[in-house]
């Protein structure tokens, strides 16, 4: 291979990378433009986007890794819960329309603090919180760190006791500076779109894929900025596995724990039972014929658990606070 040939090859690859980056950027803008716009709240050098509906006891909904607030609208949980609760579905930092500022680790604890601060700025005193998958880790941190605010928790398909796994390390590679930047902008968006159907089958198995969720999330999850957040969360989970600092026994509020019996990502049933053993006021529901996306396949199970946990919270928590920002 001559020096001239190598030079031309590098130029060709660089041009292809730039072209792919521009194309992926255009698709990312289209994906954002296609989603419904909710409200923004600005605080702590960032902003959070959320959807809101209903009246009654405040109920926060936190999505998992790679998703956004629409996870709960497409499942029907958002609309059905709004008949009884004041529901706020957040885009967690780095997902949907909520940015994830660089320069600080967005751990579950950091996300818990900023979301609780946002809720307080909205004038809400006490609330319940539902978290799916990575959102479950944030919900539990909110219960531990903000005891005066959290009245009850429902965790869905949570990986509460992560172990060091090669898959976590590989998933975190796109978060690596320089190399990760090139991958996220040039190569990964196309790979994500090509493998989307396979990924959906894996997380929904043994249930069928919910097409409204799959269609809504595909464009958002393949954006370069969101791919950075998607890959950062396995890195944080790996760090948590290597240096565990879990104190679930500190949680003093009612907690509902839901897991799909057929979850293909990890042993969700064992995770749920172990978590129940650590929390004094915990209820467990292992849902048959459901996988990691149990809230999409069986939303009625999640809604029923929300009502059970709400019934265990004090009556005083049910007063609706001011909506002033």
Where do the model's predicted regions map?
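Catalytic active-site module of serine/aspartate enzymes centered on a nucleophile-bearing elbow/loop
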Residues: 280-325
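Short amphipathic, positively biased membrane-proximal segments
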Residues: 1-47, 120-121, 145, 184, ...
């Amino acid at each position: 291979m001559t020096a001239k040939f190598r030079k031309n090859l590098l130029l060709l690859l660089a041009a292809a990378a730039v072209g792919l980056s521009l194309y992926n950027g255009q698709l990312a803008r289209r994906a954002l433009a296609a989603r419904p716009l909710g409200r923004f709240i600005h605080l702590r050098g960032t902003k959070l986007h959320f959807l809101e509906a209903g009246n009654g006891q405040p109920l926060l909904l936190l999505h998992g890794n790679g998703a956004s607030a629409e996870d709960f609208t497409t499942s029907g949980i958002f609309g059905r819960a709004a008949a009884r609760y004041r529901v706020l579905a957040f885009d967690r930092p780095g997902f949907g329309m909520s940015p994830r500022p660089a320069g600080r680790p967005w751990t579950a604890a950091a996300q818990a603090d900023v979301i609780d601060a946002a809720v307080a700025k909205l004038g809400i005193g006490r609330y319940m919180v539902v978290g799916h998958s990575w959102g479950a880790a944030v919900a539990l941190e909110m219960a531990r760190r903000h005891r005066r605010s959290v009245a009850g928790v429902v965790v869905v398909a949570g990986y509460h006791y992560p172990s060091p796994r090669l898959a976590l390390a590989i998933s975190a590679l796109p978060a690596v500076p320089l190399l990760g930047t090139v991958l996220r902008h040039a190569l990964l968006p196309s790979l994500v779109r090509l493998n989307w159907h396979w990924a959906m089958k894996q997380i929904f198995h043994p249930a069928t894929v919910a097409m409204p969720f799959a269609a809504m999330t595909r464009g958002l999850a393949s954006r370069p900025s969101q791919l950075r957040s998607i890959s950062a969360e396995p890195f944080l989970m790996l760090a948590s596995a290597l240096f565990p600092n879990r104190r679930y026994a500190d949680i003093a509020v009612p907690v509902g724990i839901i897991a799909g019996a057929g979850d293909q990502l990890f042993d969700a049933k064992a995770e749920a039972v172990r978590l129940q053993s650590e929390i004094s006021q915990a209820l467990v529901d292992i849902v048959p014929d459901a996988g990691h996306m149990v809230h999409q396949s069986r939303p009625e199970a999640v809604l029923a658990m929300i009502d059970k946990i709400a019934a265990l919270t004090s009556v005083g928590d049910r007063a609706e606070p001011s909506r002033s920002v």
